Amino acid sequence: MTAVPNRQIQLQFQSAYGFVHQDLSAVRCVSDRFLWLGCDETATLERVTIEGDIAADHKHISLTDYLDLPNETDEEVDVEGIAYSDHYLWVVGSHSLKRKKAKLDASDAENIERLARLEQEDNRYLLARIPHVEGELFKICSQPDNPEITLTAAQLEFKKSGNTLIKVLKDDPHLGAFLKADIPGKDNGFDIEGIAAYPSEEDGETRIFIGLRGPVLRGWAILLELQLEADGSDLKLTKMGPDKVRYRKHFVDLRGLGIRDLCPIGNDLLILAGPTMDLSAAIRLFCLKDIDHLDNDALLNPDAVLEIPYGQGFDKAEGITLLPDGNLLVVYDSPGSDRVNQAMTAVLADVFELSS
C-alpha cells in the first residue's frame, strides 16, 4: 500500500533561483537543521535551514568556488547524490551520457536525427568532498573538534573518458560493456544516483557507497563500495581488503528497480528505488541491514519498507534524508502543481514516518 506523508515541509528559495524547485535530485540533512539540496540542471548546491515545517534562508552555492570542474561556465554537474561524514559534504554527479530528446516543435526527421546524438558532459563525472562546518562550506579549514587537523576540498581526477573510477570500471565484467558501448543513462546505461558515506572503523578512511540507477542486470541493481584517500586536492581509490580491490560490487534485489538515492540510518542503509528508464512507475524504499558486515562482493536482499507515491509524469521521488526526529524527508523532481507556490519559488517535500 502506498504510504501517506504525516506532514510536509515547504522548501523556500530565493526568487532569482526559484527554478531549482522543479529539478531537485538529491538531499541531505546535516547538523539537524541544514538541508543541502542538489539540482540536476546546475553546477550548484542549495542550502536551506529547517524551522518547523519551513526550510528557508536559502543559499545558492557554486561548486566552482570549492572544486576544479572541467567546464566552469554553465555546464551542469547533474548532482545525483549528497552525503555527509566527519565534517565533509560529499557530492556525486551522474557519470552518465545523454541522448538528445525529441522536441515537440521539431519534424519527425529532425527528431530521429536528434535521437541518434549522444553527449558527454565532463562535469557530470564529479565525485568530491567539501569541508563543512556549521552549515558553511570551505576549500580548506581546521577541523573544529581538533584544530591540528586540516580539512581540504578534494575530488577524483577527471580523465578524457570521465574520471579514474570510470577508467577502472571499463575493465569490469558486468559494467565494462555498458561503458565501452557508450550507452546513455536513461537507456539502462551507467548512471549514478545516490551516495552514502560511513566512517571506516578499520583505518579511519571513509567508506563510500554509490548507487547505480542503471544498468540493472536481470533485475539486480548494483551498489558500488569505495574507499577514497586524499592527496592534497586529489582523491584516489584506495585498495581494500586482503584482495586489494579498488572497489566492491554488490548486487541488490530491488524487484527490478534501479537505485535512485541512498541514506544511512545507523549501521543500515536506506535505498530509494525506482525505474531505470524514463517512465512513471513504482517508487519503493528498502532497508539494507548491517552495512558494516559487507566484506566481499555480495548478492543482497534488503527489506521493503515503504511504497512512495508518484504521479504520471510528475512527483518523481529523487532524494531522501533522515530528519532529526527520525522521520524520512522525500524531495521530488518534476513536482506536481499542488506542491508549488504561486510565485514558483517554493515547493513542498513529504515527510514519512519510519516504523521502528
Residue ranges and their predicted role:
Residues 1-356:
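Sequence/structural signature of beta-propeller domains
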